[in-house]
Every structure is written in C-alpha cells, then in structure tokens.
UniProtKB/Swiss-Prot annotation:
Keywords of this entry: ATP-binding, Cell inner membrane, Cell membrane, Membrane, Nucleotide-binding, Repeat, Sugar transport, Translocase, Transport
Residue numbers binding ATP: G46, E47, N48, G49, A50, G51, K52, S53
Protein name in UniProt: Arabinose import ATP-binding protein AraG
ABC transporter domain residues: 14-249, 249-505
Protein species of origin: Pseudomonas syringae pv. syringae (strain B728a)
Enzyme class (EC, first level): translocase
Length: 507
C-alpha cells in the first residue's frame, strides 16, 4: 500500500489556473482557479448550470478552454483531445458511461491497448489482464461476460477498473450514484476511499449532501460559472453553510414579474404515475398562473412533462382540463386538447435544424379555416411566420434562414411562436432559458407573463433557483420522482427550495 501511495502522490496536485470557457452567447466558466491535492477526495458543488460538468469536460479533453491551463504536478496542459487527457493520467467517469455494451468486459477494459502477438489480439493475455484489474474491485465479474448483461453498478466498476488499467493519477466522478442502489453506493464509496488512500487526486461531483460529508476531504463551490470558495477542511463546514454558499447571490431585476388574477381551474393532475415518477403526483394549476417546478438532475420533472404532453403513457392517475376528464395516448391528443410542450433539448426535440425559421414556426400549425386550398394555405403560412417572427422579436435575416444558424434565444422564441399559432390552454416549458443570454431571457420572461395575463396556464421546469423564484406565482419542488414541497411566491427562498430538492436518504 505504501508503495502505491508514493507512486501516485508523486504525480502531484491538480491545479486549474484561470480556466475560462465561452459558448456562443454564454460564458460557461470565468477565471476558475483552485487546487485539488493528491490523496484527497475534492467535491465540486453548485446548482445545475454552475459549470461543474463543463470543467470536467475540459479536464477530460472533450472541451478546450478559451483561457487558462491545467497543471498536474509541475506539468502544464491544454488538452486538445480525450487521448491527450488520458495520456496525462486523467480519467473522467461520466454519468453516462463510455463503454460498449456489445463487447465483453475484457474488451472494454483494454480497448485501445489490447495485448497482441504476431499482429493478432492475444485473447488469453487479454482475459488474464482483465481478471487482474478486476481482482479486489469486482471479483464477481467474469471478464468474458458481455458488458450489456451487467448491472449499472457493475458497469461503473468496469469503468473504474479501466481508469486503473491506465494508471490514472486524476480520477473525476460526475454524479456517480444517480442510478445506483444503496448497496452499490456503499461499495463505490469504499472504492473511492481506496483510490484516495493510494495517493490519487479524486474529483467528485454530486448533489447528494450525505455523500459529500461521507467521503470528501475538501469542497469547492461554483456559482454561475465562477469560483465561489474552497473549504479545505470538512470540519469547517455543515449542511446549512454549504447550501448558503451554493445559493448566495443578488436577484437581478430581469424577471418582469407582475401580480395577476387567476381565472379559475385549468389542469388538475391526480395520483399520476409513470416512468420516472416513484410516488403518485397530484397538483393543479389555474388559468393565468405561472407554476414553477424546481428540482435537481434526476428529480423527475422532465419525465412528468413527457406524461403531460402524451410522449409517454401513465400507469395510474387521472387528468382533468377545464373540469372535464382528459386521456392522453399520444402527443397529438395533448396538442388537440391545447397542452403544448417546449422541450428541454430544443436542438434535438424542438427544432428541425436544416429547415427554415418559417417552416419551424409552421410545423403542425394550420389556419383555423379548413379546405382553403394549397395557394391560400401557403399564403397563410407565410403571413403566420412573419407575424410570429415580429411578435416574438425573433432576430433573423429572413424567414427563410435555416434555424440552426440562429442563437439559442431566437430558436426558443421561434418555438414559442409555433405554439402561439395554435389554440393553447396549457403551456409546458422545460428549461426555457437554458443556454440563453440574459437579454433573450428577459424577453422570454415577458412572453411568459403575457401568456399568463391572457389566461394561459404556464408550467415552467427550471433548475435555476433565481429564475423559478423570479417568474412563478407558486413553486412545486421535486426530488427523486416525487413532489417534496409546495411554496407560494412570498414563502420561497433559495435555502428552503434547495433543501427540499436535495436527496438525503436512499433506500
């Protein structure tokens, strides 16, 4: 053991020196500088969108920083590829594992550096080496087993063994327990302690407070892509102080909130169950109300929206719209009922990238007068696209411009324009301002408030605490597939919302 400690400790500390990363219209990281010591588990904490995953992608070579360098020991780096990161002794174990299900465990472990003899893969040596790597880590896993036949927890152990096969000095874990059982979590914690005790640098990203206090030696907090503080000693820290550090910032006056009168019941959900919901979900939203849903990654909010929009089928529960029973078997049922969804991943699910702005606005939209003929239909579509571009303030050179060349904010406004072309009663907005600059955010907030003033029930999923507090009349909090709290606008504060959203136990 002492030899292993000395082997990895000589790799030195991991230092981030002035790391900056800018995407079009968004500053993801700004001047990030801190140090993680060998022989320690260093947590990265912050809300969704704080910049943790972006930093890990830079560490792993998937992204290249616009400024700054990494330093491991005395050597400075700016990785231009994942191969360069691996060669420097870095392994990043992502939430979605980078393994090949159809290959055997041994093939996955040694992919890229398989033993060979006379130019052919030496399979005997490959399986022996794989067995050595799994020994003491996952003795029950047969190297000959097809990886797709393993549990998620076992696949994660294979990913860790793969990192060890490359003698990684720096190992980063990104939300590693999000889909693990309590027993698998216990096992993972023990392995992380073992890796730490060998002198490696361990970075650990998790929203689970109990894991942070259980296994970590230091914590660095991020907020809006900026470094906030590093706590070098866990003894200096408790749950409330960490939450306060994560959420502390001034509210910017960009939300355009104004009080409004609600106009009677709109959508009522009773005892709803389905994929991603682990307890029956019950709530109601009023006409003219903006109802916010807050939660962390994996809370079940997007899964709830998929049920409400007919993308997935419920296994239990009932829906009522305007006091009448509603059954959703498909997205068409939801659209015809007036329940419209702006999805979280607009590039994959919200737009057709190669089509024009006008074509994207008119997807599914039809004039209220039927049987008008092709010429009149075409004229209506042109007029409708121009009208929505103007009313939504979509910045585009032309309605015929391919939508892929617009900014994220203008793409989102075009999607909203599409739905305004149709009869609407309930609007579902899943992370409506993710990846959008502040100016476009303010415009989208204004659109939301105008829709509510017109009597539309607007339900907004957001991982941004300030946003959900700034635009909502009422806030529901979800955690691990269940509603864990409800707060009126004047009751909500960041600490209460985050405490309701943070999972504390796992059965």
């Amino acid at each position: 053991m002492q030899q292993a400690i000395e082997q990895y400790a000589t790799g030195g500390a991991l230092r981030f020196n002035g790391i900056g990363k800018v995407f079009p219209g968004v500053k993801a990281l700004s001047d990030i500088s801190f140090e993680a010591r060998p022989g320690s588990v260093h947590a990265l904490m912050g809300e969704n969108g704080a910049g943790k995953s972006t930093l890990l992608k830079i560490l792993g070579g998937s992204y290249q920083p616009n400024s700054g360098t990494l330093q491991i020991g005395e050597q400075s780096y700016q990785f231009k590829s994942t191969a360069e990161s691996i060669a420097a002794g870095v392994a990043v174990i992502h939430q979605e594992l980078h393994l090949v299900p159809e290959m055997t465990v041994a093939e996955n472990l040694l992919l890229g550096h398989m033993p060979n003899r006379f130019g052919l893969i030496n399979r005997g040596a490959m399986y022996r080496r794989a067995g050595e790597l799994l020994k003491g880590l996952a003795d029950e896993i047969d190297p000959h087993t097809r990886l797709g036949d393993l549990s998620l927890g076992q696949r994660q152990l294979v990913e860790i063994a793969k990192a060890m096969s490359r003698n990684a000095h720096v190992i980063a874990f990104d939300e590693p327990t999000s889909s693990l059982s309590a027993r698998e979590i216990d096992r993972l914690m023990a392995i992380i302690v073992r890796l730490r005790d060998e002198g490696r640098v361990i970075l650990y990203v998790s929203h689970r407070m109990e894991e942070i206090f259980r296994v970590c030696d230091a914590v660095t907090v991020f907020k809006d892509g900026r470094f906030v503080k590093t706590f070098e000693q866990m003894a200096d820290l408790d749950h409330d102080r960490l939450v306060t550090c994560m959420v502390g910032r001034d509210i910017q006056n960009i939300y355009n909130y104004r009080p409004r009168q609600h106009q009677g019941p709109s959508l009522r959900v009773t005892g709803l169950l389905g994929p991603g919901l682990h307890e029956p979900v019950t709530f109601a939203v009023q006409k003219g109300e903006v109802l916010g849903f807050f939660g962390l990654v994996g809370a079940g909010r997007t899964e709830l929206f998929r049920l409400l929009s007919g993308l997935t089928r419920s296994s239990a529960g009932t829906l009522q719209l305007d006091g009448k029973p509603l059954t959703l078997k498909s997205p068409r049922d939801a659209i015809e009922a007036g329940i419209l969804l702006c999805p979280e991943d607009r590039k994959k699910e919200g737009i057709v990238p190669l089509s024009s702005v006008a074509e994207n606005i008119n997807i599914g939209a039809r004039p209220r007068h039927v049987n008008l003929g092709c010429l009149i239909q075409g004229r209506w579509e042109r007029d409708n696209a121009r009208s929505q571009i103007k009313s939504m303030n979509v910045k585009t050179p032309s309605p015929e411009q391919q939508i892929m060349f617009l900014s994220g904010g203008n793409q989102q406004k075009a999607i909203l324009g599409r739905w305004l072309s149709m009869p609407m009663k309930v609007l579902l907005l899943d992370e409506p301002t993710r990846g959008i600059d502040v100016g476009a955010k303010s415009e989208i907030y204004e659109i939301i408030h105008n829709l509510a003033a017109d009597g539309i029930a607007v339900i907004v999923v957001s991982s941004d605490l300030m946003e959900v507090m700034g635009i909502s009349d009422r806030i529901l909090v979800m955690s691990e597939g269940a509603i864990t709290g409800e707060l009126n606008r004047d009751e909500a504060d960041e600490s209460r919302l985050l405490q309701l959203a943070l999972p504390r136990t796992r059965g």
